[in-house]
């Protein structure tokens, strides 16, 4: 029989060895010869090293090396020749950038350096091959990690960029997983007061969002996905908080959200059912059924 004492791990010693390995891999990112393996190892360990983001950000040449990985594959985007190997490698670099994007110590500097903009060419791609799909999904993951923090500075930054039309395009034609992350990003932008005001500021912006959400509802009625539907309903509910958008939604909310189309999909999802009921209630409140009931403007 083994004694428990010998089987017990020695966390401090192991942690120290791991720490030395982390430093070594970060150093190896600076050299093109050792970078690929270092990217792979660090991306595998990123969940278990809480302060990896500051280590990456403050170490010499590391962020430049990660950006070089991204820029290196721009030529493979158009014409679309990206291989699985290239995609895996750059996605490891993106995973490390996601780590920097979501850490409170490095997030502001990450935004100030406009690093998300380096990812936008990937979100512009339309090729349906797996390497491109993986690239888009991982890039969306970086933006998703940013908005998940619920920080005002993130929304303020994103609104100065083209992220909304990029997300809308992916919501219309991406894979189910990409659509889900893109819709989550839009939802997070809408849940911010500045984001909601921005989208409802012009009819063009609102109608673009409403049109894509409407198409998604139609698609979801044919190929249901409870997870994706949840985000779509939340986007609609949030839009209904804006008086002008609420007025427009009374005309353009898809019938499938008003009838029993999704009853089966949502039977166990009390949260989404509650949101949907609230949405319908919001659109009914203060509604004038007879236009003759609207007072005429003063002559």
UniProtKB/Swiss-Prot annotation:
Query: Keywords on this record?
Result: Acetylation, Activator, Cytoplasm, Nucleus, Repressor, RNA-mediated gene silencing, Transcription, Transcription regulation, Translation regulation
One of its GO biological process terms is: mRNA catabolic process
Q: Which residues carry this modification: N-acetylmethionine?
A: 1
Q: Kindly list the residue ranges recorded as spanning the membrane.
A: none
UniProt-annotated location(s): Nucleus; Cytoplasm, P-body
State the InterPro entries in the record: ARM-like, ARM-type_fold, CNOT9
> Which organs or tissues contain this protein?
Detected at low levels in bone marrow and thymus.
Q: Which GO terms describe its cellular component?
A: CCR4-NOT complex; cytosol; nucleus; P-body
* Induction, as annotated: Up-regulated by EPO and EGF. Transiently up-regulated by retinoic acid in F9 teratocarcinoma cells.
Q: Name one GO molecular function term.
A: kinase binding
Family from the record: Belongs to the CNOT9 family.
What does this gene product do?
Component of the CCR4-NOT complex which is one of the major cellular mRNA deadenylases and is linked to various cellular processes including bulk mRNA degradation, miRNA-mediated repression, translational repression during translational initiation and general transcription regulation. Additional complex functions may be a consequence of its influence on mRNA expression. Involved in down-regulation of MYB- and JUN-dependent transcription. May play a role in cell differentiation. Required for retinoic acid-induced differentiation of F9 teratocarcinoma cells. Does not bind DNA by itself.
Quaternary structure and interacting proteins, as annotated:
Homodimer. Component of the CCR4-NOT complex; distinct complexes seem to exist that differ in the participation of probably mutually exclusive catalytic subunits. Interacts with MYB, ATF2, RARA, RARB, RARG, RXRA, RXRB and RXRG. Identified in a complex with ATF2 bound to target DNA. Interacts with NANOS2. Directly interacts with ZNF335.
Q: What is this protein called?
A: CCR4-NOT transcription complex subunit 9
